[in-house]
Regions:
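Periplasmic/cell-envelope proteins involved in peptidoglycan metabolism and beta-lactam response
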Residues: 1-325, 336, 345, 370, ...
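Beta-lactam-recognizing serine transpeptidase/beta-lactamase-like catalytic domain environment
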Residues: 3-4, 200, 259, 301, ...
C-alpha cells in the first residue's frame, strides 16, 4: 500500500570492520527482515479489513481504524520477534566463556550506538580499538587445571619410583627367597649354599660337594630339627626358605671371591646362625616322644626362640624318596610336614583361663573378694559345665579357682564379663591378628563378640567352644607376662657369618609392645606360681628353680582323650625361659604336658 504505510528505505551500512561488522550486519538484516514481514502482514490485514468494512464507512474513518490496527499488530509481532531473537542469543551465550560473553555484549552495544547516532564508522573504530579485558578468574581457573594435571603426573611419578624402590630395596630379599623366582638359580651357579647352625655351633644343614662338582644338601641332625630347618626339595620350607638370600650370598673377602671367579669356581655361601640351643632342642624332642604334639621355648627378655619341635616328623635327608608316602591318604592324619608349633591350631583349654582372669581383674577391682562354691557340675545359660572328672572343689576364692583350674567357677566368672570388652582384650592379645614373626604360622581365632549368644560364654570362659590357639601364640602371651607385660618379637636367627666365622650381621630382640600393664603381669605371675605350688602343676614344685605356669586339658571330640597343655616360665621371679607344650589326644595337662615341660626346664637349668 501507499501513503502513510510506506516505510522509507534505510541506507545499508558502509565498509564494515572485521568480524564485528559482519555480526552487526547479520543482526541488522534480521531486524529489517522482521520489520519487512510486519509491513506486509499489516497491509494484508488492512486490505482484508477494508473489504469487510467497505460498505457503511467513509474512507477517512477506514484509514484511521486500519492504521491503529496495523500499529498494534506490528508491535505484537516485533515483540515476539525480539523475544525469539533474545532467546537465540542466550542459548548461544551458554556455549561461550565469560570473556566471550562480555565481548558479544560489547558488540551488541556497539551496533545499538551505531543505529542511534548514525555514525557507524566512528563508533566501530572507537569500540573495536579497545582491547577486550580478560577476567583474572578465567586465567586462575586455567592455572588451577594446569596445576592439577602437573600434580597428577608428579604423583604418578612418585608412586612409580616408590614402587620400584620398594622392590629394589625393602622387598628384594622376599623376591629372591620366593621359590618361584627362577633367578635363584643364578646365585646357585656361583655360590655353594651356606650352612645353618645352632647358637652353640651344631651344624643343622650343609652342602657337600663331590669330586665331580655335584652338590648334595645334608642335614646332620635329621628329624630333630626337621620342621624348623626345613628342606630344599619340592620347593623350599622353613629356614631354608626364609634364609635363602643369606645362604646364597657370599661375604668372603674380595680377593678370595676374585680368585674363585678367575678359576671358574664357586664361593662358599654365608652361614646362618640360629637362636636354637641344641641341648634344649633335644630335651623338647625327647619330651614329646612318639606322640603327636609340639613344644616351643622362648627367651622372654629378648624374643629368641631357643627350641621348636613338632611331631610326627620326617627325615629331610630322605624326603625326596619319602615324599609320596608322606603325602599319601594313609598319612594324612599325621600331617608330618605341618609344623604344629607354629601352624597347629587347638582349643587352648584351661590355659585360656589366664585371659579370662585378666579380663575379670580389669572389670572388677574387687576381684580378690570373689568366692564360689564348686559342686563339680553346674548349668550356666542352659549349658552344663563340668570340672575335670566332676571333681568338687568346694569353697574357692579367685586364686584357688585358678590354681585348681575349676571349670564351673570360671564359667561363672565368664557370665559376669562384658562380651565386647572381653573380645577387645583378645584383640589386644593378638587373637584374629597377624603375629610379629617372620616365619609361617596360623592365626589364632576368638569369635565371641558383643552380639554373641549367652550360651557361648561358659565354654569360651574355660578355653573351649570355638576359640583356637597355636603353641607359638600361647608361649608369646606367657613370655609377655614373664617380661612385665611387654612382648618381645620372636625370632629364629641370631646372626649371619661368612664361612670363616666373621660376623656379617647381628640380630637383636625388638619389643612389640605392652600386652598388659606391669601390675597385671605381676598379679598373673602370682596366680601362676600358686598353680605350681598347690594346684594342677604341683609336679613342678620343690625343684631347684621355681616355675609359674598353667595347665590345660582341651576337649576336642566327644569320647576322645583331651589335648594336654602346659605353658609357663622359670625362674618365676626372674624369668629366663618360657615353655609351652601340647600333646595331642592323651588326657589331662597335669598328667602329660607338665612332666614333658619339666624335662625342658631341667635341661636348661642343669646346663647352667
Amino acid at each position: 500500500m501507499e501513503g502513510p504505510f510506506k516505510r522509507k528505505k534505510k541506507e545499508e551500512p558502509r565498509n564494515m570492520i572485521g568480524k564485528n561488522r559482519r555480526r552487526g550486519r547479520l543482526e541488522d538484516k534480521t531486524e529489517n527482515s522482521a520489520k519487512k514481514r510486519t509491513e506486509e502482514e499489516a497491509r494484508s490485514y488492512a486490505e482484508s479489513h477494508f473489504l469487510q468494512e467497505e460498505q457503511g464507512r467513509d474512507n477517512e474513518k477506514n484509514d484511521q481504524l486500519t492504521k491503529e490496527d496495523i500499529l498494534k499488530i506490528r508491535q505484537i509481532l516485533e515483540a515476539e520477534e525480539k523475544e525469539k531473537k533474545q532467546q537465540e542469543l542466550q542459548e548461544q551465550d551458554e556455549f561461550l566463556s565469560d570473556t566471550e560473553q562480555r565481548s558479544e555484549k560489547r558488540k551488541r552495544i556497539l551496533w545499538k550506538k551505531q543505529k542511534e547516532n548514525g555514525n557507524e564508522e566512528e563508533v566501530i573504530e572507537e569500540e573495536t580499538s579497545k582491547p577486550v579485558e580478560k577476567d583474572p578468574r578465567d586465567q586462575a581457573g586455567i592455572n588451577r587445571q594446569i596445576l592439577k594435571v602437573a600434580y597428577l603426573f608428579a604423583g604418578l611419578f612418585l608412586v612409580l619410583m616408590g614402587y620400584i624402590g620398594y622392590f629394589v630395596g625393602a622387598d628384594s630379599k622376599n623376591i629372591i627367597t620366593n621359590s618361584r623366582n627362577e633367578r635363584q638359580e643364578l646365585f646357585a651357579k656361583s655360590v655353594i649354599r651356606g650352612n645353618i647352625e645352632t647358637s652353640d655351633g651344631e651344624v643343622l644343614a650343609k652342602t657337600e660337594v663331590a669330586e665331580d662338582g655335584t652338590e648334595k644338601r645334608v642335614y646332620p641332625q635329621g628329624r630333630q630339627y626337621a620342621h624348623v630347618v626345613g628342606y630344599t626339595i619340592k620347593g623350599k620350607y622353613g629356614l631354608e626358605s626364609a634364609q635363602n638370600y643369606n645362604l646364597l650370598t657370599s661375604n668372603a673377602n674380595f680377593f678370595e671371591r676374585l680368585y674363585h671367579t678367575l678359576r671358574n669356581e664357586k664361593s662358599q655361601g654365608d652361614t646362618v646362625v640360629t637362636t636354637l640351643n641344641s641341648r634344649l632342642q633335644k630335651a623338647a624332642y625327647d619330651a614329646i616322644g612318639d606322640r603327636k604334639g609340639a613344644a616351643i621355648v622362648m627367651e622372654p627378655s629378648t624374643g629368641k626362640i631357643l627350641a621348636m619341635v613338632s611331631r610326627p616328623d620326617f627325615d629331610p635327608n630322605t624326603l625326596s624318596d619319602d615324599w609320596a608316602y608322606i603325602n599319601s591318604e594313609a598319612e594324612q592324619e599325621n600331617s608330618r610336614l605341618l609344623n604344629r608349633a607354629t601352624q597347629g591350631l587347638y582349643p587352648p583349654g584351661s590355659t585360656y583361663k589366664i585371659i579370662t582372669a585378666l579380663e575379670y581383674m580389669r572389670e572388677n577391682t574387687n576381684y580378690k573378694d570373689y568366692h564360689y562354691n564348686c559342686e563339680g557340675e553346674s548349668v550356666f545359660h542352659s549349658v552344663s559345665i563340668e570340672c575335670y572328672n566332676k571333681h568338687r572343689h568346694g569353697e574357692e576364692d579367685f586364686y584357688e579357682s585358678f590354681a585348681n583350674s575349676c571349670n564351673t567357677s570360671f564359667a561363672n566368672i565368664g557370665t559376669s564379663l562384658n562380651k565386647k570388652k572381653w573380645a577387645d582384650l583378645c584383640e589386644e592379645l593378638l587373637f584374629n591378628k597377624a603375629l610379629p614373626v617372620s616365619f609361617p604360622y596360623s592365626k589364632s581365632s576368638f569369635v565371641l563378640n558383643g552380639k554373641s549368644d549367652d550360651e557361648e560364654v561358659p565354654q569360651t570362659a574355660i578355653g573351649q567352644g570355638k576359640t583356637l590357639m597355636s603353641p607359638l601364640h600361647n608361649v608369646m602371651i606367657t613370655s609377655a607376662i614373664a617380661n612385665g607385660g611387654v612382648l618381645m618379637k620372636p625370632y629364629l636367627v641370631d646372626q649371619i657369618e661368612n664361612y670363616t666365622g666373621g660376623s656379617v650381621r647381628k640380630f637383636t630382640g625388638k619389643a612389640y609392645g605392652a600386652l598388659m600393664t606391669a601390675g597385671e603381669a605381676e598379679e598373673l605371675t602370682a596366680m601362676m606360681k600358686q598353680v605350681v605350688e598347690e594346684g594342677t602343676a604341683s609336679y613342678l614344685s620343690g625343684r631347684s628353680y621355681t616355675v609359674a605356669g598353667k595347665t590345660g586339658s582341651a576337649e576336642f571330640k566327644e569320647g576322645e582323650p583331651a589335648h594336654a597343655w602346659f605353658t609357663g616360665f622359670a625362674p618365676a621371679d626372674n624369668p629366663e625361659i618360657a615353655v609351652c607344650v601340647i600333646i595331642e589326644n592323651v588326657g589331662a595337662g597335669s598328667t602329660y604336658a607338665v612332666p614333658a615341660a619339666s624335662k625342658i626346664f631341667d635341661a636348661y637349668f642343669s646346663g647352667k
